Amino acid sequence: MYLVTNYILPIFIRIWLGLFFGFMGAGVGYLMGALMAPTSLFFVVTMTSSVLTCGLGSALGWVSFTSSKTSIALILISGVLGAFIGAGLGWVIGKDVYIMGGMPGIAELSGIIKGATVGGNVPPIIIGSIRIFRRGEL
């Protein structure tokens, strides 16, 4: 029972928080980019802003505010970098997998958002799990 309450349950709660904040951040970033982007740079601005906020939101689920500043910075940077890598993979895979007629651009958007959310959560999950199991730091 000690293993479940002190190690396993916090990991699942933080994974859920990371996914929740990641999707919410992606939505907020997309709206910010869509409202502020000029027409010629619409795709670049909306995707960059949604991926950046998605990575920050995903990492926010794993930040422990009692940690050192370097540990917090490592988690935030790894979340953003993971989100950019995941968004790139989601964009490439999304064009081929999601075929929706009459909705141009929605396949890329869906792949980018899903890839950024998953990619933004993987590095903080690894770092946070190591931190929980090695140091017992939640």
What is each stretch, according to the model?
Residues 14, 99-138:
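Alpha-helical membrane-associated segments of multi-pass integral membrane proteins
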Residues 1-42:
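N-terminal signal-anchor transmembrane alpha-helix
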Residues 50-72:
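Canonical alpha-helical transmembrane segments
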Residues 16, 20-21, 71-89:
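Transmembrane alpha-helical segments of multi-pass membrane proteins
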Residues 10, 14, 18, 42, ...:
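Residue-level signature of transmembrane alpha-helical entry/exit and packing/kink sites
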Residues 24-36, 56-64, 85-93, 97, ...:
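Alpha-helical membrane-inserting segments
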Residues 33-45, 89-118:
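Interfacial non-cytosolic loop connecting adjacent transmembrane helices
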